[in-house]
Amino acid sequence: MEMKIAGLTFGYSNIEVLKDLWIDFSGAQLISILGPNGVGKSTLIGCICNILQPKSGAVYIDGTSVRDIPVKELAKMIGYVPVSTSDSFPMIVVDAVLMGRHPHSKWKVEEEDLKKVYDVLVRLEIDDLAMRNFNELSAGQHQKVSLARGLVQEPRILLLDEPTSNLDIRHQIEVTRILKDLSREKDMLIIMISHDINIATAYSDNVLLMYEGGIYAAGNPWDVITKDSIRTVYGVDCDIVDYKGRPRVILDQTIANHKATDWVPPYTEEHHPTLMKRGD
């Protein structure tokens, strides 16, 4: 499976949020999108899954623009789990998760659908919630149920907007590890937005660092997460240490005077990276 983002530009009114993005993705892997608030991370996810329509450029899956793929077929190819949900389902958790099977089974529930649901609930350690009312769950439990719904959809590409934001640190680590494992087991490209740099770099095959509506850097975590990139993008000083073969950010107390007013996104049609699965 290959996905290509070609010259993607998006804006609200006269304000450009994404500016001429170029990047390719190839193979099953876990990719984390990093960057401060307001740089276009969620907007990029929205354009990939065709919720938002770019002003120019396009997103291609195996050579076909997502705008040209019928909605039902696109739902089988791309799953999307938003950062938070205002969903209010007067139903039990099993039924809420079963909604993710709709692109495959429509509204007829088969035994195989139920098995897939329970397998995912067990994997996410929420099988004890199966018969609970969805509306009675905590924010963190809601988030895991929403993730379960995305996983049972079994898409080729799964897009997650801060899937661990309401979870405690143990479950943040556990969910991120599960996502990496599932990318291998299900031959799936999983792209998640994260604000935890250290957890993201510990488990991601590649990372994409966004800044000012563009891609500051993308690739191997060691190539992307550097003292200079953290200083420029986040405006803080730090040290980078090697922890079990992965970069770990140790923050300084200093707020850096970093504003790069002349920064230009480095990737173009002629020169942009292809993010491929790394060797474990």
What would you call each of these model-derived segments?
Residues V233-D280:
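ABC ATPase nucleotide-binding domains
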Residues L158-E162:
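Catalytic Walker B motif of ABC-type/P-loop ATPase nucleotide-binding domains
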